[in-house]
Amino acid sequence: MLSPLNVLQFNFRGETALSDSAPLQTVSFAGKDYSMEPIDEKTPILFQWFEARPERYGKGEVPILNTKEHPYLSNIINAAKIENERVIGVLVDGDFTYEQRKEFLSLEDEHQNIKIIYRENVDFSMYDKKLSDIYLENIHEQESYPASERDNYLLGLLREELKNIPYGKDSLIESYAEKRGHTWFDFFRNLAVLKGGGLFTETGKTGCHNISPCGGCIYLDADMIITDKLGVLYAPDGIAVYVDCNDNRKSLENGAIVVNRSNHPALLAGLDIMKSKVDAHPYYDGVGKGLKRHFNYSSLQDYNVFCNFIEFKHKNIIPNTSMYTNSSW
């Protein structure tokens, strides 16, 4: 068995590949061994562009940002050219005009392996929960405490929020669908990666017949630049994420999430947390705490060691290029 850091660097960099008959390598964390599960060369790559201001695009423009500072559309097209044997999905959402939707069609026609997937066309209902149930569960929890231990201010807020749920909008998913900030982006990224291959197959797009609905996907932010084919990837228990490092302090990020199967239990754990809190965050809770729960991370472990264990990096990906420019939002 190899150390977690060495296995991840060695295999993610695509410098070796295990044969079909070779036993899988294993890595350990918190006293438990995990197989380095393969993510094969047919696994689709997924990008995402949720556009809060579609009116900023001119006539004949694909409504995905493509400026000198933020060449996101060019990065997606470049990935499609390099990974020409993979399906490249782009999950999109926004109040697009008819003409802008035609531009998406033109993009698909010009690059046959690019598939535009509209968020509203994907069935995410299996991941939903009534907002009223979330509020009621939190209210009942507060009410179960002795009177001296209750947070009466919070209890009042919860009751007020419960009353203010709009008619016909009693849905966790619908509440995020109406947002136009980073949590809008982050929440549906989590659901898309949970669906994995099913995100591609259920939309009926041509060219997706070789994708298994139970398979995984490789999610990359549009500021991640692919420079060559990724090959076969390996991840502990079939999941890994991008890790940022600033002044030797590491942190889990959601700019890249790779999974070998749909409904990965680490992301399901994060979704369970999202469904239990009224103030949950799709990045901190849905990804970070979900991973920690799944892999039994606690404050007793070294956080940097955990980040090394779960890190996705690849010699053929230049990550997080937008860190050098201002936000595109």
From Swiss-Prot:
<feature type="short sequence motif" description="DXD motif">
    <location>
        <begin position="221"/>
        <end position="223"/>
    </location>
</feature>
<keyword id="KW-0800">Toxin</keyword>
<keyword id="KW-0808">Transferase</keyword>
<feature type="binding site">
    <location>
        <position position="72"/>
    </location>
    <ligand>
        <name>UDP-N-acetyl-alpha-D-glucosamine</name>
    </ligand>
</feature>
<dbReference type="GO" id="GO:0043657">
    <property type="term" value="C:host cell"/>
</dbReference>
<feature type="binding site">
    <location>
        <begin position="48"/>
        <end position="50"/>
    </location>
    <ligand>
        <name>UDP-N-acetyl-alpha-D-glucosamine</name>
    </ligand>
</feature>
<dbReference type="GO" id="GO:0085034">
    <property type="term" value="P:symbiont-mediated suppression of host NF-kappaB cascade"/>
</dbReference>
<feature type="binding site">
    <location>
        <begin position="327"/>
        <end position="329"/>
    </location>
    <ligand>
        <name>UDP-N-acetyl-alpha-D-glucosamine</name>
    </ligand>
</feature>
<feature type="glycosylation site" description="N-beta-linked (GlcNAc) arginine; by autocatalysis">
    <location>
        <position position="159"/>
    </location>
</feature>
<dbReference type="GO" id="GO:0046872">
    <property type="term" value="F:metal ion binding"/>
</dbReference>
<keyword id="KW-0328">Glycosyltransferase</keyword>
<comment type="similarity">
    <text>Belongs to the glycosyltransferase NleB family.</text>
</comment>
<dbReference type="GO" id="GO:0052040">
    <property type="term" value="P:symbiont-mediated perturbation of host programmed cell death"/>
</dbReference>
<keyword id="KW-0964">Secreted</keyword>
<feature type="binding site">
    <location>
        <position position="322"/>
    </location>
    <ligand>
        <name>UDP-N-acetyl-alpha-D-glucosamine</name>
    </ligand>
</feature>
<keyword id="KW-0325">Glycoprotein</keyword>
<dbReference type="Pfam" id="PF24688">
    <property type="entry name" value="SseK_NleB"/>
</dbReference>
<dbReference type="GO" id="GO:0005576">
    <property type="term" value="C:extracellular region"/>
</dbReference>
<feature type="glycosylation site" description="N-beta-linked (GlcNAc) arginine; by autocatalysis">
    <location>
        <position position="13"/>
    </location>
</feature>
<keyword id="KW-0464">Manganese</keyword>
<dbReference type="GO" id="GO:0052031">
    <property type="term" value="P:symbiont-mediated perturbation of host defense response"/>
</dbReference>
<feature type="glycosylation site" description="N-beta-linked (GlcNAc) arginine; by autocatalysis">
    <location>
        <position position="293"/>
    </location>
</feature>
<feature type="binding site">
    <location>
        <position position="322"/>
    </location>
    <ligand>
        <name>Mn(2+)</name>
    </ligand>
</feature>
<keyword id="KW-0843">Virulence</keyword>
<protein>
    <recommendedName>
        <fullName>Protein-arginine N-acetylglucosaminyltransferase NleB</fullName>
        <ecNumber>2.4.1.-</ecNumber>
    </recommendedName>
</protein>
<feature type="binding site">
    <location>
        <begin position="219"/>
        <end position="222"/>
    </location>
    <ligand>
        <name>UDP-N-acetyl-alpha-D-glucosamine</name>
    </ligand>
</feature>
<feature type="active site" description="Proton acceptor">
    <location>
        <position position="253"/>
    </location>
</feature>
<comment type="function">
    <text>Protein-arginine N-acetylglucosaminyltransferase effector that disrupts TNF signaling in infected cells, including NF-kappa-B signaling, apoptosis and necroptosis. Acts by catalyzing the transfer of a single N-acetylglucosamine (GlcNAc) to a conserved arginine residue in the death domain of host proteins FADD, TNFRSF1A and RIPK1: arginine GlcNAcylation prevents homotypic/heterotypic death domain interactions and assembly of the oligomeric TNF-alpha receptor complex, thereby disrupting TNF signaling. Has preference for host FADD as substrate compared to TNFRSF1A and RIPK1.</text>
</comment>
<dbReference type="GO" id="GO:0106362">
    <property type="term" value="F:protein-arginine N-acetylglucosaminyltransferase activity"/>
</dbReference>
<feature type="binding site">
    <location>
        <position position="320"/>
    </location>
    <ligand>
        <name>Mn(2+)</name>
    </ligand>
</feature>
<feature type="binding site">
    <location>
        <position position="223"/>
    </location>
    <ligand>
        <name>Mn(2+)</name>
    </ligand>
</feature>
<keyword id="KW-0479">Metal-binding</keyword>
<dbReference type="GO" id="GO:0016757">
    <property type="term" value="F:glycosyltransferase activity"/>
</dbReference>
<dbReference type="GO" id="GO:0090729">
    <property type="term" value="F:toxin activity"/>
</dbReference>
<feature type="glycosylation site" description="N-beta-linked (GlcNAc) arginine; by autocatalysis">
    <location>
        <position position="53"/>
    </location>
</feature>
